A protein has these predicted regions:
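Short helix/turn-capping signatures at newly exposed starts of structured segments
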Residues: 1-171
Length: 171
């Protein structure tokens, strides 16, 4: 898994080591290419749960990478590492490529780019981490450098990135 080359091509496909997993592709074709997924709820998980696919009528509807910066899979989108790049850097590229409506109603934790059907999610935001540091100090229990570093990593790198069929985020 670790050395896989994964490229996200919005509104079209994900390339996994050159193997195309296309939006709208039949589940049987996907699983012939990358193996059988593990069904949990309505999602199928692949590559040790680092990638999930939602199917609609047995066709790929949404693909999500769930592992963030510490995961095995390192997808790229528009030539940028989705998880290793700074969250703000990727956010600017996605805004530019989307060139339209963005759902950003979760106070910086997630963004849904409607024109390119891409969504990203953070586990923390820098402002919340700063508040957490101040509160911990205020309660007489300051955070350690390791704890601060961990929280800042969560605030500065996307935890998930997903792509859906055209119109996915307008539903």
């Amino acid at each position: 898994c670790e050395d896989m080359n994964i490229e996200i091509c919005p509104l079209d496909k994900v390339l996994v080591d050159g193997e195309a997993i296309c939006l709208g592709m039949e589940q049987s074709t996907v699983e012939a290419a990358i193996g059988k997924g593990i069904l949990v709820g309505k999602r199928y998980y692949y590559f040790n749960d680092d990638m999930a696919i939602d199917y609609n009528d047995n066709k790929v509807d949404f693909i999500e990478f769930l592992s963030g910066i510490d995961g095995m899979l390192k997808p790229s989108i528009y030539g940028i590492s989705a998880f290793e790049s700074q969250a703000d850097d990727l956010l600017e590229v996605l805004k530019e490529k989307n060139n339209g409506k963005i759902n950003d109603t979760e106070n910086g934790y997630s963004y849904q780019f409607q024109n390119i059907s891409v969504g990203v999610y953070l586990e923390a935001v820098p402002e919340a981490v700063k508040e957490m540091i101040e509160e911990a100090s205020g309660f007489g229990n300051p955070m350690t450098d390791d704890e601060i570093q961990y929280e800042m990593k969560r605030a500065n790198h996307w935890a998930t990135i997903g792509l859906g069929v055209a119109g996915y985020y307008q539903r």
